[in-house]
Curated annotation (Swiss-Prot):
Keyword Cell inner membrane applies: no
UniProt-listed GO biological process terms: proteolysis involved in protein catabolic process
PROSITE patterns noted in UniProt: PROTEASOME_BETA_1, PROTEASOME_BETA_2
Location of this chain's protein in the cell: Cytoplasm; Nucleus
Protein name (database record): Proteasome subunit beta type-7-B
Substrates-to-products reaction catalysed: Cleavage of peptide bonds with very broad specificity
Enzyme type, top EC level: hydrolase
Superkingdom field: Eukaryota
UniProt-listed Pfam families: Proteasome (PF00227)
Annotated CDD domains: proteasome_beta_type_7
SUPFAM superfamilies xref list: N-terminal nucleophile aminohydrolases (Ntn hydrolases)
Length: 274
């Protein structure tokens, strides 16, 4: 071991060098990029045979609708799915990472994944980043211990509830659940209630919109109902599209030449000496 490596004092687990750099750049006039507001409505509930998850399909970039039919219900394991709200890249990256870890665990043990295992992996990862990973999740699944539903916040805190909502449209969706949820719901009653909660978020929140996706998870079976409901169908003025007059439209009557005629005269003479 070299003497230089021994003389270096040990550092802590977190470095604030980049924070100081960003503060210095801001003082010199650099405008830091602003955060874009995100919008989503994701929900979940437990019914008598399993778990039902639901989500809208609108993705936004501030005031712009970036995608009208994106998927917000992510695969975690054959018996576990997860709805994501927040930054789309963060939710997809986090769920894909944990999904791969669950698959390796199944290969190692030969057993089905448990919902609490996925919950622990997600909350530990999000807590380590102190909320800078913008992923708010609703995790649901059915394992050997029964149906489970959890919410995971970007800072790593979790809740275990019989019904849950997250996202910018969560208050509107929660009002539907609190008014109509009851224990022992059937599959059809649960799907209807989840769809109504998502529609409430779609119609009362500008960040939510487009269609309704639903995922039903029971013991040994899952059913992904893509575009189960389309409360805002895309309509046109004419079913045949736009039509134009069948003739040439006169745009200009005055013609302006681009260049005037220029005469070029060739001058005879001796070449210049170098």
């Amino acid at each position: 071991m070299s003497q230089s490596s021994v003389d270096i004092p040990p550092k802590g687990g977190f470095s604030f060098d980049l924070c100081k750099r960003n503060d210095m750049l801001t003082q010199k006039g650099l405008k830091a990029p602003s955060f874009l507001k995100t919008g989503t409505t994701i929900v979940g509930l437990i019914f008598k045979d399993g778990v039902i998850l639901g989500a809208d399909t609108r993705a936004t970039e501030g005031p712009i609708v970036a995608d009208k039919n994106c998927e917000k219900i992510h695969y975690m394991a054959p018996n576990i799915y997860c709805c994501g709200a927040g930054t789309a890249a963060d939710t997809e990256a986090v769920t894909d990472m944990v999904s791969s870890q669950l698959r390796l665990h199944r290969y190692q043990t030969g057993r089905d994944s448990r919902v609490v295992t996925a919950l622990t992996l997600l909350k530990k990862h999000l807590f380590s980043y102190q909320g800078h990973v913008s992923a708010a999740l609703v995790l649901g699944g059915v394992d050997i211990t029964g149906p489970h539903l959890h919410t995971i916040y970007p800072h790593g805190s979790t809740d275990t509830l019989p019904f849950a909502t997250m996202g910018s449209g969560s208050l509107a969706a929660m009002s539907v659940f609190e008014a109509k949820y009851k224990e022992g719901l059937t599959r059809d009653e649960g799907i209807k209630l989840v769809a109504e909660a998502i529609c409430s978020g779609i119609f009362n929140d500008l960040g939510s919109g487009s269609n309704v996706d639903i995922c039903v998870i029971t013991k040994g079976h899952k059913e992904y109902l893509r575009n189960y409901m389309e409360p805002n169908p895309r309509t046109y003025v004419s079913s045949k599209g736009y039509s134009f007059t069948k003739k040439t439209e006169v745009l200009l009557t005055k013609i302006t030449p681009l260049l005037e005629r220029v005469e070029i005269v060739e001058v005879a003479g001796e070449a210049m000496e170098e």
